[in-house]
C-alpha cells in the first residue's frame, strides 16, 4: 500500500467559506472515529515492530484518519500547522485557545505534520494508551466546560449519523443501560468506565 493512493480523493468542507456547520459534523466524525480506532487497532499497534506506519492500521482506519486530517488541514496545503489547529478549535466552539497550547501540539511532531507524520503520531500514542483514557478524551472534546456530561440527544445524533452508525434499537439499548438524567445529560465518565471495566464504579 503506497502513500500516494491515500493522499487524493478525500472530500471535506470548503476552507474559507465561513460555513462551520459541515466542519463541525465532520470533525465530530473524526473524533468519534479516533475513539473507535483504538478498540479495533490497538492489538495490531502494540504487536507490530514494523517501521511502516501504514501497516499498523487497515484500509478503513487509514481512510478515517485521512478524513480527520483533511478536516484539520484548513488551508489545504497538505500540512497541519498552528493556524489549522486554531481554525479547527474555533469550529468546535473554542475560540480562545492559547498560542502556547497550539505550539505545544505542533511541537509534538518531529517536523512538519503531513499525513504520514499525523498517522505516525496516532500510532505512537496508541501503543501505550489506556482504552478508558482514549474514550474519555473523545467525549471531553464535546464537553467544552468540563462538566463530566454531554447531552444525550447530541450523542444519539452522532451515533446514528457518523462513523459506524448505530441503529435506533442500538441507541435505545445503550440508553436503557446508561439512562440520561432528568435534564437529558449523559454521565460519560461512568459510561467509559463500564465500557472498559464491565461494571459500574462503586
From Swiss-Prot:
<feature type="binding site">
    <location>
        <position position="77"/>
    </location>
    <ligand>
        <name>Ca(2+)</name>
    </ligand>
</feature>
<feature type="region of interest" description="Disordered">
    <location>
        <begin position="1"/>
        <end position="21"/>
    </location>
</feature>
<feature type="domain" description="EF-hand 1">
    <location>
        <begin position="60"/>
        <end position="95"/>
    </location>
</feature>
<feature type="binding site">
    <location>
        <position position="84"/>
    </location>
    <ligand>
        <name>Ca(2+)</name>
    </ligand>
</feature>
<feature type="domain" description="EF-hand 3">
    <location>
        <begin position="166"/>
        <end position="201"/>
    </location>
</feature>
<protein>
    <recommendedName>
        <fullName>Myosin regulatory light chain 10</fullName>
    </recommendedName>
</protein>
<dbReference type="GO" id="GO:0005739">
    <property type="term" value="C:mitochondrion"/>
</dbReference>
<dbReference type="Pfam" id="PF00036">
    <property type="entry name" value="EF-hand_1"/>
</dbReference>
<dbReference type="InterPro" id="IPR002048">
    <property type="entry name" value="EF_hand_dom"/>
</dbReference>
<dbReference type="GO" id="GO:0005509">
    <property type="term" value="F:calcium ion binding"/>
</dbReference>
<dbReference type="InterPro" id="IPR050403">
    <property type="entry name" value="Myosin_RLC"/>
</dbReference>
<keyword id="KW-0677">Repeat</keyword>
<keyword id="KW-0479">Metal-binding</keyword>
<dbReference type="InterPro" id="IPR011992">
    <property type="entry name" value="EF-hand-dom_pair"/>
</dbReference>
<comment type="subunit">
    <text>Myosin is a hexamer of 2 heavy chains and 4 light chains.</text>
</comment>
<feature type="domain" description="EF-hand 2">
    <location>
        <begin position="130"/>
        <end position="165"/>
    </location>
</feature>
<dbReference type="InterPro" id="IPR018247">
    <property type="entry name" value="EF_Hand_1_Ca_BS"/>
</dbReference>
<feature type="binding site">
    <location>
        <position position="75"/>
    </location>
    <ligand>
        <name>Ca(2+)</name>
    </ligand>
</feature>
<feature type="binding site">
    <location>
        <position position="73"/>
    </location>
    <ligand>
        <name>Ca(2+)</name>
    </ligand>
</feature>
<keyword id="KW-0106">Calcium</keyword>
Amino acid at each position: 500500500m503506497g502513500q500516494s493512493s491515500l493522499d487524493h480523493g478525500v472530500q471535506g468542507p470548503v476552507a474559507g467559506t465561513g460555513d462551520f456547520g459541515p466542519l463541525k459534523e465532520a470533525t465530530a466524525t473524526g473524533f468519534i472515529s479516533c475513539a473507535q480506532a483504538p478498540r479495533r487497532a490497538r492489538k495490531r499497534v502494540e504487536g507490530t515492530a514494523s517501521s511502516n506506519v501504514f501497516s499498523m492500521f487497515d484500509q478503513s482506519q487509514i481512510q478515517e484518519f485521512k478524513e480527520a486530517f483533511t478536516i484539520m488541514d484548513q488551508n489545504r496545503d497538505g500540512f497541519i500547522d498552528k493556524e489549522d489547529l486554531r481554525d479547527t478549535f474555533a469550529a468546535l466552539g473554542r475560540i480562545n485557545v492559547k498560542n502556547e497550547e497550539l505550539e505545544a501540539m505542533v511541537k509534538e511532531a518531529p517536523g512538519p505534520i503531513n499525513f504520514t507524520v499525523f498517522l505516525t503520531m496516532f500510532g505512537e500514542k496508541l501503543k501505550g494508551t489506556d482504552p478508558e483514557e482514549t474514550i474519555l478524551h473523545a467525549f471531553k472534546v464535546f464537553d467544552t466546560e468540563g462538566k463530566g456530561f454531554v447531552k444525550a440527544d447530541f450523542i444519539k445524533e452522532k451515533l446514528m449519523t457518523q462513523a459506524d452508525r448505530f441503529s435506533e434499537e442500538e441507541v435505545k439499548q445503550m440508553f436503557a443501560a446508561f439512562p440520561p438524567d432528568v435534564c437529558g445529560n449523559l454521565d460519560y465518565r461512568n459510561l467509559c468506565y463500564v465500557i472498559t471495566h464491565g461494571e459500574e464504579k462503586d
